């Protein structure tokens, strides 16, 4: 694979690359990338779309580290209680491994690291104090505004959070920082301050945040707005069937976004097209080689919302089926990580 192909593979299905020139320059060597997940609530299909991208990194010859950011999960308004950090970290790692495997990646080639393995080291701690001394309160709050829970009287942990996330890039020796577009503020802070702390400004790749199935932003607290990794085929079908998906409209259409950012990348990796099966009386089977073709047909009215939903539900269930099987084979993971929900 030449440099142009690798660059295209890495930048596809992203919201933003900062910057493409820097990313291209990295490909002359052996770049490394990292993504971090704070083990808080249950993982869902929104996580799957970002984790699927790790298969692209691997195919492009980029070494990947996944940080299970256990300390971050507690620092952000104690979203995860201290006594549940280990259980939730174990659940997150198992889920991420299953998702990457389902997406065609190799979880055994990923380096999984937990925050407490290095974030309590003396060198890391001293560097964090130095960074805290040099960074203003307003700059820190601005960096974390899309990630950390905000209030009129914020906890100190939420202010330490973006400083640590910036330092994680250096500590993990990552050339590329990858995450959702909501992480942009933190990584822009990292690009500013890391050169003053013995590190390099990372290249940043940002994934889009998907709309919820009810329209608008996906909500972890709204059960019907997302598909869980353990949802059975009937639940997947029911949620997709009830999703906001008005004829011809693309904006805030979670069904189309799932198809674009999850289903199509997996199909492309397999060399398969998106197939919509319909009775002959309703026009017969449709085949779409690219997402752009599918979206155009939807906007023009050649693809009915219900036909799209039926096909999307099948492909999504196929994608999460091996993940669901692994997690249901280990019910202890969810019971121990979320005892209030599974007792």
Language-model segments: residues:
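Active-site beta-loop-alpha junctions enriched in small/polar residues
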Residues: 38, 71, 115-117, 209
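N-terminal catalytic cores of NTP/NDP-binding nucleotidyl/phosphoryl-transfer enzymes
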Residues: 11-77, 177-184, 190
């Amino acid at each position: 694979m030449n440099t142009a192909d690798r660059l295209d593979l890495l930048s596809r299905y992203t919201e933003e690359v900062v910057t493409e020139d820097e990313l291209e320059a990295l490909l002359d060597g052996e770049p490394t990338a990292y993504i971090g997940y704070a083990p808080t609530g249950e993982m869902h299909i929104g996580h799957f779309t970002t984790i699927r991208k790790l298969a692209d990194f691997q195919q492009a010859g980029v070494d990947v580290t996944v940080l299970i950011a256990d300390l971050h999960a507690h620092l952000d308004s104690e979203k995860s209680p201290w006594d549940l950090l280990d259980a939730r970290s174990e659940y997150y790692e198992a889920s991420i491994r299953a998702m990457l495997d389902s997406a065609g990646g190799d979880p055994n080639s990923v380096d999984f690291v937990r925050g407490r393995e290095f974030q309590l080291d003396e060198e890391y701690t001293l560097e964090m104090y130095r960074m805290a001394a040099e960074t203003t309160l307003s700059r820190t709050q601005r960096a974390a505004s899309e990630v950390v829970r905000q209030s009129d009287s914020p906890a100190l942990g939420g202010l330490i959070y973006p400083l640590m996330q910036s330092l994680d890039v250096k500590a993990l020796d990552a050339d590329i920082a990858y995450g959702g577009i909501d992480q942009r503020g933190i990584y822009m802070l990292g690009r500013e301050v890391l050169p003053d702390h013995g590190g390099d400004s990372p290249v940043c790749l940002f994934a889009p945040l998907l709309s919820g199935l009810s329209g608008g932003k996906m909500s972890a607290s709204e059960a019907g707005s997302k598909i869980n990794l353990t949802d059975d085929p009937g639940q997947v079908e029911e949620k997709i069937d009830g999703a906001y998906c008005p004829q011809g409209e693309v904006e805030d259409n979670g069904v189309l976004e799932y198809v674009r950012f999850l289903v199509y990348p997996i199909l492309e990796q397999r060399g398969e097209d998106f197939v919509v099966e319909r009775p002959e009386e309703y026009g017969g089977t449709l085949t779409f080689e690219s997402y752009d073709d599918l979206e155009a047909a939807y906007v023009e009215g050649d693809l009915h919302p219900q036909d799209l939903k039926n096909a999307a539900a099948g492909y999504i269930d196929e994608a999460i089926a091996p993940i669901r099987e692994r997690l249901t084979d280990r019910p202890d993971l969810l019971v121990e990580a979320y005892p209030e929900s599974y007792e």
